[in-house]
Amino acid sequence: MLVLGLETSCDETGVALYDSERGLLADALFSQIDLHRVFGGVVPELASRDHVKRMLPLIRQVLDEAGCVATEIDAIAYTAGPGLVGALLVGASCAQALAFAWDIPAIGVHHMEGHLLAPMLEENPPEFPFVALLVSGGHTQLVRVDGIGQYELLGESLDDAAGEAFDKTAKLIGLNYPGGPEIARLAEQGVPGRFVFPRPMTDRPGLEFSFSGLKTFALNTWQQCKNAGDDGEQTRCDVSLAFQQAVVETLTIKCKRALKQTGLKRLVIAGGVSANKALRASLEEMLAGMKGNVYYARPQFCTDNGAMIAYAGCQRLLAGQQQDLAISVQARWPMEQLPPL
């Protein structure tokens, strides 16, 4: 089955072609970072308009790259949520229009299920069951995964997601959008131990997260340095390192608890923050000590992309899941509501 995947949940237009027998044939992405950087964050209306502009040229690009023609496509998968409603509607409308014109099925895919399954595109994919850490700009969740659509939420953030905390903290200390990669870059030059940030909610049982207080702690630390005339580049690096260390250690502690609670020794990390090198190193060290394994997608498939949507949609289509031509998207969509395969 040859599936065209469309991703438009936020500020990246992703298109890919995935074949159930040959694997990923082509993948293309247009990032809107430059468009939104001047505003310090994503402007939903601008995001939607740019998706409209980029979608069809990217579809043509992946068809050319794969050496395919439209009549060879068996189905279309598109992100139906969660995400920005206007942006989601662009992908959904395009998918359903093409599906109607080509007389093929279209299926809406859960954005976070796409992230969750992205490591399945790699050479050594994880086997079920496993624990997944979904960590992005909009989500921080620990999920037990027994199969596609078989999800048990173990814990999640009670306020800011980890990726959101990265972006907001970066903005507070004067860094450009998107803040996560900027903090990671500066953290490499930071002096360890100069600042020590708290590890929120690690001193109590449970698998919930909270990052809003950590963001405030970073702001107060930066403000104190500014008031003392110590707000140079090295201080910015040191604050970035302390913040990143706090987030990484907090996530690692919670992942270890989740693995012990479930008795599992396979951990998948997915979502934009899973590209963070410090987080990967920390989780790899932790799993090595437990004689377990950690899995993640290559960096280009950690952030939003069409490949993960094409793959996730293909699995559901192969299992016989169907959907009518109604255009329906959801800004919020608990992953536990998805039907199991």
Curated annotation (Swiss-Prot):
Substrate binds at L134, V135, S136, G137, G138, D167, G180, N276. GO terms for molecular function: iron ion binding; N(6)-L-threonylcarbamoyladenine synthase activity. Its cofactor is Fe(2+). It is found in: Cytoplasm. Keywords: Acyltransferase, Cytoplasm, Iron, Metal-binding, Transferase, tRNA processing. Its EC number is 2.3.1.234. Binds 1 Fe(2+) ion per subunit. Fe cation binds at H111, H115, D304. It is an enzyme of class 2 (transferase). One of its GO terms (cellular component) is cytoplasm. CDD domains: ASKHA_NBD_TsaD_bac. The keyword Cytoplasm applies. Required for the formation of a threonylcarbamoyl group on adenosine at position 37 (t(6)A37) in tRNAs that read codons beginning with adenine. Is involved in the transfer of the threonylcarbamoyl moiety of threonylcarbamoyl-AMP (TC-AMP) to the N6 group of A37, together with TsaE and TsaB. TsaD likely plays a direct catalytic role in this reaction. Belongs to the KAE1 / TsaD family. HAMAP family: TsaD (MF_01445). This is tRNA N6-adenosine threonylcarbamoyltransferase. The gene is tsaD.
